[in-house]
């Protein structure tokens, strides 16, 4: 019995490979993306606004979202730069890398020349490296928060030094 090359190649694919092949980038609106972030993100909540959002899906199930908007730092906000404000997945393999890559392709298509994001020092950045991004340094200081003696506040986000990444 002869087997064709397609049958042989099909057997070489692992279940993980097949799963990744079925994932695709889809559009998503900000409300749906924020709902996903509130349910799955480890240390941040929803964002108030965005330029655009993308999702990685398999069929009708969303496995991750990226929310892209103006840079939080006004020093970086030159009109040609966007920031991935949130990237959040349910742990699906390769989903983060797919989202970062799709965000950069969309930003370039819209005429932006730079796309940045920040990770905590405790996060490895493998998804960013896998998507072709480069580490461009660390923030000068850890976040200060908004708590003052005259106006006490409770900080709900991590106040540690962050690593800055840029898409290339």
Label the predicted regions:
Residues 27, 48-51, 58, 69-159:
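Acyl-donor binding region in acyl/amide transferases
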Residues 15-48:
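Short amphipathic alpha-helix that is part of the acyltransferase structural core
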Residues 22, 81, 162:
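A residue-level signal for beta-strand positions that form part of recognition/binding surfaces
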Residues 25, 30, 158-168:
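Contiguous surface segments at macromolecular interaction interfaces
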Residues 56-59, 167-168:
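Active-site beta-strand termini and strand-to-loop segments that position acidic
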Residues 64-65:
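Short glycine-/small-residue motifs
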Residues 1-21:
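Short, Lys/Arg-enriched N-terminal segments with co-localized hydrophobic residues
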